[in-house]
């Protein structure tokens, strides 16, 4: 209670409620003048004064304040009085609150105190319960195990109180219980004991409580209160006993415990009966146990005190659970073999006779360290002293009586339990004396050992003085107990005899038998455990641990000797009395005591007769301790149990085999265990190691090392693929780079340029150009390239279609600035961002010039093998082969052994196209190539035009000239090029493109470096110009469609007028499909090569010099325009940086190369096809308008339009210029001031957005086949469409065929008059022109039929064009796009004009002129061409500049539907348009677009696509005239508020699928006339300029046609009432006459009302 009082002392202080004086203000009067002022601030005042008078009081309740304030407010007249009262009340309230708070705190503290007490009480109870639990276990070793395991935490907590466990446990009657438990007990006995152990637990709890009370009383006397809750008396006595010697302490404890002996004896008797019945090892031991039980409390207290003292001296923290276990074992029942082992140990250590020290103490001391042994001995000595004194204090008779009573009680249980022991009883009787002798010897040795242990224990040296006496007493008591027990109860004697005899006999018989040793050890352990008190049990555990740790068998030998000697008198007899099974069960006790076979060996030397003999036998049997160690029970009690018994320090002792051996359990079968004390660490590979990444490379894609473009040498990577990719890119660039001179190409082929294509894994595609000027031998390069390409092409090809956009996006941005130019010195890298549609194409300008020649049969030399094939022997001897197959990793390969020649092998497989249906469609279109490749004559063009495969949606666009020896560009057929389409299920497209490239400019490296990399950023488009600043020989313009965001993220984009660049740029628009892009790029490359070859076919040798020459040098404008499906929206193209490192990002370079190669092939394919289909696509001139609009969307360059103009004029001058359109690629070669400027306009449009177009294109193909069967109606349809674009379209038609979807035609102009290629182009163009004129004539004859064929659902491929103004135009012009569309489609009357030599003029005139209603009625039939032309003109206008909606005042946004895909006007018309759609895949979608979306530079640009398309048609003059007229007409349309965005949809190719271009045109005829006039006027000068460039004749014709068209357009616009109606026109080629008729009938008034300017039709 002192604690409680102490705890209440501060509480009392708190409870001192004194009047607060600190802030108390004494008022002189209730009415204080100051109060008045204070009351002014009533609320604040109340708070202030409340605080003022508050002294550490809780906050006032608001209610009180409110009451006070209300009270004051109610008595305002008597403020001062109320204030005083309020203050008083507030003070009282604060006082009350304070008192409450104090009380609350006191209550809380009391509750906490009570709770702590309860917790402590529960802890003690738990301790007792655990002790009882473990001591009450049927098996001592199990008890030990449980103790060790479950009591670990508890033990540690108890160990924190070092002295308490000793005191409490010593005072506990555990020694008796241990003595009792020392008797071997069967499982049945254990159960009985467990039943009785509950009583013992209760007894222990009572004792503990009593001891706790004593401890509380004597808390001051004791260094630390025992954890056991003793009564105050017990605790006081224990504290006194601590000061008293161990004997006196034991006596006092005995006296104290004797008070409770009655109860204890009852429990102890039960326990002893159980223990005697269980142990039945000897009445002597049971007597000792009874004595211990009688003195259990005293012994516990004394032993605990002694142990506490010993612990104080030895500083051993004893686990209460451990102590409790032996105590509880003693009290509960020594049933558990843990008792046997523990009590045996404890008894040996704690035995009253001093035998206690014999076993456990000896074990601990000898085994572990002398200190620990001495400590254990001291504990045992203390325990022995206490126990001994207790036993002496308790008369032996009393103890014997108690034991007898317990034995008599336990005999019943033992009889049942010892049914098996009956056999042993005889032996026990016979060997009783022997066991006693052995016990005596063991006792003597134990005494000696205990003495040694005590002597070893410096802390308990004083006790060691008493030890001999104690030992004597212990021996005597043990002997007495042993003999007396044997004499007292015959049954117990019989049991002891039985146990002792069989144990001894077995041990003797098993001197050499390990099992006997184990049995002996078990019995010894059981004896030790049973005899040892709780503290002794713990000490035994400690000793075991020490022994195990020390691994010294001497100590366990001593322990066993002591234990066995002790057992000889007590436990020994019990052990002997135990059956072999019991002894086996006791084996873990041996183990627990740390007595292993080795230990037993050591024990053997120390053990007395029987025990020693047993130990000797065991040791003899176990010559090698390891063998015994190997034989270890599965139980893991050994060290852990021991450690649990011992100090925590001992717990962590070595993992010795001894420990493992000591873990042997009696019941647990022995298992051979390696004698090595340490755990064997088996290091095995991870389960996944064998299947690690190395092994899972097949299952998992190999990690691709990321090559950062920021690396000093991004090409340095662990992968050899990079080098191979370098070679691949090198060869590719060598084949593709037209911008380089032959020397440059040679230099590139020599290895100057190296590229590294990386897979989608994130490897940056790197284009590396070594600075080496050394030219690699053809063979070496071919080999290197072959190897490199073969290895890398597969991955690259697989990824090129997918990766390039993503690869080029972000990394390229930084790589532009970061990559060292030294790696890219050969070629300036332009920062090209990848399109989401994977349409990024950067075409290197190295060898494209020479490699663009495709469609040559020389390419046949390049086998159309898988991408693995890389080397092709070119005619020039150069081994160049580009193998592109997305299927295989080696699909794309390019090697240029010879600088002059490069072969491109392009192979596309269906698997490659699985990702993109549009690609598949395109490839299906490519199937036409086979036929096309086979045919060589120009008739092949006609055939392709007439015989497009229906299955090929855009095959007409891709229809490569069937073996045409003449280049579609007008170039003489490249000798080394071949574009072949393989009709393989796997291989949809395979094209071998080889072009002899004279790479003679070995200074190309520096030249390229000198070449200015100019990037023109235009709305989602990037144009790159590589121009040799030194010689300007090579000018490469690369236009890449990029995301605007990417543009913003990329390097600075200096504003540059598109007009500056379009002159030199090649628009290359690609479809969303990667393969299509690659095909387009490849075709573009091939086209570029073809153009360069066509321009310098014979000048290959001259190219090196001619290109070196400023005049003869060919500026290669490679305008690669990457268009994504998202970019289709018409937006003003932002001028891109005039200069940017062309391939600052090698990724872009590679992507450009690969994609460019593929697309060049595709473009070449479609280019040739378009040449063949060009006439049929003349109907697609309307699509050209859409394409022109796409051009506006994708390029701002008016140069393209100027080039187109010049091309058209030059094409009109068939001697100078030739334009070919393939799959949206128009290649023009024209002389430009003696400079070979090659412009490749490739405009693959994005797919996906218009899948309808593919179907429409298929229908177009079918219709084209029909048209191919019936050319006349086709020609008529062509005439109708070629009114606007026939020549232009014939010039550019194939271009727009590729341009249909969104493909920008590629114009290749060769301006060198001396250039043979240019002459060839002119020749070809002239042929094409003648052919187109012939087609025009045919179209005159069978215009309606052709229109019926022209109106094909293939045109419906762009469903956006839903209504055509004229059914004969086979185009569905939806009113949604234009409220008013002035379709200046010339009537057949105008077609007659077109029949004139100036078909272009007629087309332009028709475009510009508006037919009469009848004419319009007919023109609507012919509408597709005129509409295409007009749309083309609008595109020209848009290229020139954005046509603001104000520019089209006559075309306000129509109230009518603007549905891109819907057919608001009439599905029948659309159907007819689709049905009548000619084979030309071009589909023109007219959508109302905001002027912002339409890039317009009206004065500067004419839609390059229009011009290109016109260039495609041989009638360049018509193109020019038409374009001029369109421009003038567009000028008329400029007033329209809504700019007209027209996309040319190539029905054939999904990539060419036209993206719906909303065109907002006001229906007002006059208004349209005006804008059309303005537009025409603006376009006229540009077209005139172009025509002037082309030829004055063409200019004159164009001017004439322009004037005619202007007047006609005005008429048409006047006649057409748009009434603010927007029309969407989908014009398809090959419209059927019937459908045309239907459209006439259905739309004649509409068309009349909808008479749109041809520019509007654009």
Swiss-Prot record:
It comes from the Eukaryota. The modification Phosphothreonine is found at residue 500. One of its GO terms (cellular component) is chromosome, telomeric region. Residues 205-214, 245-254, 289-305, 365-375, 398-407, 932-956, 1407-1423 have a biased composition (Acidic residues). Residues 1607-1626 have a biased composition (Basic residues). One of its GO terms (biological process) is subtelomeric heterochromatin formation. PROSITE patterns: LRR. Residues 408-417 have a biased composition (Low complexity). InterPro entries: Leu-rich_rpt. Signal peptide: none annotated. Keywords: Nucleus, Phosphoprotein, Transcription, Transcription regulation. Residues 36-54, 335-352, 386-397, 425-435, 442-461, 471-482, 869-878, 918-931, 1097-1115, 1261-1272, 1335-1366, 1507-1537, 1550-1564, 1575-1591 have a biased composition (Basic and acidic residues). Residues 36-76, 156-499, 550-584, 589-608, 770-819, 863-964, 1082-1115, 1197-1216, 1261-1315, 1334-1482, 1503-1658 are annotated as: Disordered. It is found in: Nucleus. Residues 262-286, 568-577, 800-812, 879-905, 1082-1096, 1197-1207, 1463-1479, 1648-1658 have a biased composition (Polar residues). The modification Phosphoserine is found at residues 532, 579, 583, 608, 662, 865-866, 888, 911, 937, 1092, 1096, 1098, 1166, 1176, 1178, 1214, 1254, 1290, 1326, 1332, 1403, 1409, 1450, 1454, 1539, 1590-1591. Involved in the clustering of telomeres at the nuclear periphery, forming discrete subcompartments that accumulate a complex of histone-binding silencing factors like SIR4. Required for SIR4-mediated anchoring and partitioning of plasmids. Interacts with SIR4. This is Silent chromatin protein ESC1. The gene is ESC1.
């Amino acid at each position: 209670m002192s604690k409680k009082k102490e705890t209440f002392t501060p509480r009392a202080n708190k409870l001192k409620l004194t009047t607060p004086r600190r802030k108390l203000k004494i008022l002189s009067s209730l009415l204080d003048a100051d109060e008045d002022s204070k009351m002014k601030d009533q609320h604040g005042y109340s708070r202030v004064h409340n605080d003022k008078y508050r002294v550490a009081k809780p906050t006032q309740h608001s209610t009180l304040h409110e009451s006070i304030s209300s009270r004051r407010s109610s008595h305002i007249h008597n403020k001062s009085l109320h204030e005083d009262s309020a203050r008083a009340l507030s003070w009282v309230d604060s006082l009350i609150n304070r008192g409450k708070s104090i009380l609350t705190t006191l209550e809380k503290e009391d509750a906490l105190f009570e709770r702590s007490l309860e917790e402590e009480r529960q802890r003690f109870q738990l301790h007792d319960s655990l002790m009882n639990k473990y001591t009450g276990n049927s098996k001592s070793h199990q008890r030990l195990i449980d103790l060790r395991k479950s009591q670990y935490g508890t033990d540690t907590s108890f160990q924190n109180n070092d002295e308490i466990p000793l005191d409490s446990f010593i005072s506990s009657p555990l020694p008796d219980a241990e003595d009792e438990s020392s008797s071997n007990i069967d499982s049945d006995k254990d159960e009985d004991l467990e039943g009785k152990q509950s009583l013992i637990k209760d007894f222990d709890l009572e004792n503990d409580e009593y001891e706790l009370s004593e401890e509380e009383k004597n808390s001051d006397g004791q260094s630390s209160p025992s954890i056991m809750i003793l009564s105050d008396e017990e605790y006081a006595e224990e504290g006194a006993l601590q000061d008293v010697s161990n004997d006196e302490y034991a006596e006092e404890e005995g006296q104290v415990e004797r008070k409770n002996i009655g109860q204890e004896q009852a429990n102890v008797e039960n326990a002893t009966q159980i223990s005697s019945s269980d142990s039945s090892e000897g009445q002597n031991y049971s007597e000792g146990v009874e004595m211990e039980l009688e003195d259990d409390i005293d012994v516990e207290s004394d032993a605990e005190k002694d142990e506490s003292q010993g612990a104080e001296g030895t500083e051993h923290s004893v686990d209460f659970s451990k102590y409790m276990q032996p105590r509880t074992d003693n009290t509960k029942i020594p049933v558990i073999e843990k008792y046997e082992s523990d009590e045996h140990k404890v008894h040996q250590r704690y035995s009253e006779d001093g035998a206690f020290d014999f076993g456990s103490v000896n074990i601990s001391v000898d085994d572990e360290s002398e200190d620990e042994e001495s400590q254990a001995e001291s504990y045992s000595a203390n325990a022995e002293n206490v126990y001994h004194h207790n036993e002496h204090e308790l008369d032996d008779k009393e103890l014997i009586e108690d034991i007898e009573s317990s034995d008599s009680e336990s005999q019943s249980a033992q009889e049942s339990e010892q049914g098996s022991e009956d056999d042993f009883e005889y032996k026990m009787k016979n060997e009783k004396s022997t066991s006693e002798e052995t016990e005596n010897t063991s006792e003597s040795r134990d005494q000696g050992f205990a003495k040694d242990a005590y002597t070893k224990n410096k802390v308990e040296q004083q006790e060691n003085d008493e030890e001999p006496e104690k030992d004597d007493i212990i021996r005597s008591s043990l002997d007495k107990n042993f003999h007396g027990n044997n004499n007292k109860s015959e049954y117990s004697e019989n049991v002891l005899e039985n146990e002792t005899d069989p144990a001894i006999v077995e041990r003797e018989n098993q001197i050499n038998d390990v099992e006997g040793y184990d049995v002996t050890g078990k019995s010894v352990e059981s004896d030790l455990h049973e005899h040892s008190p709780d503290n002794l049990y713990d000490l035994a555990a400690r000793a075991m641990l020490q022994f195990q740790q020390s691994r010294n068998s001497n100590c366990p030998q001593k322990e066993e000797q002591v234990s066995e000697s002790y057992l000889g008198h007590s436990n020994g007899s019990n052990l002997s009395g135990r059956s072999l099974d019991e002894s086996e069960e006791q084996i873990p006790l041996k183990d627990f005591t740390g007595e292993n076979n080795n230990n037993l060996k050591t024990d053997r030397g120390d053990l007395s007769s029987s025990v020693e003999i047993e130990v000797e036998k065991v040791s003899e049997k176990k010559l090698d301790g390891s063998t015994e160690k190997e034989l270890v029970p599965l139980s893991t009690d050994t060290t852990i149990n021991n450690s649990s018994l011992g100090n925590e320090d001992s717990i962590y002792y070595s993992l010795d085999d001894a420990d493992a051996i000591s873990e042997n359990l009696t019941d647990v079968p022995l298992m051979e265990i390696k004698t090595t004390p340490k755990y064997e660490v088996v290091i095995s590979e991870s389960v996944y190691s064998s299947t690690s990444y190395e092994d899972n490379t097949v299952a998992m894609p190999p990690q691709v090392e990321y090559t950062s473009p920021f690396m000093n040498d991004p090409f340095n990577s662990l992968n050899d693929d990079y080098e191979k990719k370098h070679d691949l890119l090198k060869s590719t660039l060598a084949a593709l780079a037209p911008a380089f001179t032959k020397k440059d190409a040679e230099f590139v082929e020599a290895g100057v340029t190296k590229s590294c294509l990386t897979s989608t894994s994130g490897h940056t595609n790197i284009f590396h150009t070594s600075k080496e000027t050394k030219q690699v031998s053809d063979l070496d390069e071919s080999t290197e390239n072959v190897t490199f390409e073969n290895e890398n092409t597969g991955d690259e090809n697989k990824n090129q279609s997918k990766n390039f956009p993503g690869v080029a996006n972000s990394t390229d941005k930084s790589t532009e600035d970061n990559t060292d130019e030294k790696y890219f010195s050969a070629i300036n890298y332009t920062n090209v961002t990848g399109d989401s549609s994977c349409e990024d194409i950067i075409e290197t300008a190295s060898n494209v010039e020479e490699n663009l020649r495709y469609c040559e049969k020389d390419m046949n030399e390049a086998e159309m093998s898988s991408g693995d094939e890389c080397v092709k022997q070119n005619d020039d001897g150069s081994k160049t082969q580009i193998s592109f197959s997305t299927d295989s990793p080696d699909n794309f390969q390019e090697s240029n052994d010879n600088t002059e020649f490069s072969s491109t092998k392009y192979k596309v497989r269906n698997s490659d196209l699985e990702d993109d249906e549009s690609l598949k469609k395109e490839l299906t279109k490519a199937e036409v190539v086979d036929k096309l490749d086979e045919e060589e004559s120009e008739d092949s063009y006609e055939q392709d035009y007439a015989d497009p495969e229906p299955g090929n949606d855009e095959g007409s666009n891709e229809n490569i000239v069937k073996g045409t020896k003449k280049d579609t560009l007008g170039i003489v057929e490249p000798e080394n090029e071949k574009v072949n389409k393989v009709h393989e299920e796997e291989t949809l497209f395979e094209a071998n493109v080889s072009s002899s490239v004279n790479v003679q400019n070995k200074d190309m490296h520096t030249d390229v470096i000198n070449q200015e990399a100019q990037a023109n950023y235009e709305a989602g488009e990037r144009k790159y110009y590589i121009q040799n600043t030194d010689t300007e020989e090579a000018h490469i313009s690369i236009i890449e469609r990029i995301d605007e965001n990417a543009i913003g993220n990329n390097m600075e984009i200096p504003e540059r007028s598109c007009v500056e660049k379009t002159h030199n740029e090649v628009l290359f628009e690609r479809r969303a499909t990667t393969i299509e892009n690659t095909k387009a790029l490849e075709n573009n490359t091939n086209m570029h090569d073809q153009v360069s070859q066509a321009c310098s076919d014979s000048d290959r040798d001259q190219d090196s010099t001619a290109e070196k020459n400023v005049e003869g040098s060919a500026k290669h404008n490679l305008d690669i325009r990457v268009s994504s499906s998202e970019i289709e929206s018409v937006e003003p193209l932002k001028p891109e940086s005039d200069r940017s490192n062309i391939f600052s990002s090698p990724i872009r370079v590679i992507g450009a190369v690969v994609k460019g190669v593929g697309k060049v092939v595709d473009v070449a394919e479609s280019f040739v096809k378009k040449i063949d289909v060009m006439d049929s696509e003349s109907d697609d001139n309307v699509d050209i308008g859409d394409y022109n609009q796409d051009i506006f969307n994708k390029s701002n360059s008016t140069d393209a339009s100027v080039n187109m103009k010049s091309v058209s004029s030059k094409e009109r001058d068939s001697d100078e210029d030739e334009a070919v359109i393939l799959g949206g690629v128009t290649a023009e070669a024209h002389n430009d001031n003696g400079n070979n400027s090659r412009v490749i306009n490739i405009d693959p449009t994005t797919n996906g957005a218009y899948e309808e177009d593919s179907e429409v294109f298929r229908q177009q193909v079918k219709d084209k086949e029909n048209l191919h069967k019936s050319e006349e109606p086709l020609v008529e349809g062509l005439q109708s469409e070629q009114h606007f674009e026939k020549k232009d379209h014939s010039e550019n038609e194939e271009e727009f065929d590729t341009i249909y979807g969104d493909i920008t035609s590629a114009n290749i102009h060769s301006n060198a008059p001396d250039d043979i290629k240019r002459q060839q182009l002119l020749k070809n163009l002239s042929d094409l022109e003648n052919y187109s004129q012939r087609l025009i004539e045919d179209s005159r004859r069978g215009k309606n039929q052709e229109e019926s064929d022209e109106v094909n659902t293939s045109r419906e491929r762009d469903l956006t064009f839903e209504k055509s103004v004229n059914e004969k135009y086979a185009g569905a012009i939806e009113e949604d796009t234009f409220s008013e569309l002035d379709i200046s489609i010339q009537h057949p009357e105008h077609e007659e004009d077109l029949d004139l030599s100036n078909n272009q003029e007629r087309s332009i005139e028709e475009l510009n002129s508006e037919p009469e209603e009848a004419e319009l009625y007919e023109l609507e039939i012919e509408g597709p061409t005129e509409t295409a032309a007009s749309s083309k003109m609008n595109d020209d206008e848009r290229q020139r500049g954005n046509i603001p909606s104000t520019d089209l005042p006559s075309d306000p946004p129509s109230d009518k539907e603007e549905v891109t895909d819907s057919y608001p006007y009439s599905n029948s018309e659309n159907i007819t348009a689709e049905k009548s759609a000619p084979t030309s895949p071009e589909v023109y979608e007219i959508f109302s677009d905001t002027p912002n979306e339409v890039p317009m530079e009206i004065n500067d640009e004419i839609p390059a696509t229009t011009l290109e398309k016109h260039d495609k048609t041989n009638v360049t003059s018509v193109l020019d005239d038409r374009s001029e007229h369109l421009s003038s007409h567009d000028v008329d349309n400029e007033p329209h508020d809504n700019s007209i965005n027209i996309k040319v949809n190539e029905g054939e190719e999904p990539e060419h699928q036209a993206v719906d271009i909303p065109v907002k045109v006001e229906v007002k005829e006059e208004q349209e006339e005006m804008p059309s006039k303005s537009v025409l006027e603006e376009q006229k000068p540009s077209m005139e300029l172009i025509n002037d460039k082309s030829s004055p004749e063409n200019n004159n014709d164009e001017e004439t046609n322009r004037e005619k068209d202007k007047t006609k357009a005005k008429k048409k616009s006047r006649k057409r009432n748009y009434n603010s109606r927007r029309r969407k026109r989908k014009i398809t080629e090959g419209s059927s006459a019937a459908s045309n008729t239907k459209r006439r009938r259905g739309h004649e008034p509409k068309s009349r009302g909808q008479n749109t300017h041809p520019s509007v039709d654009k």
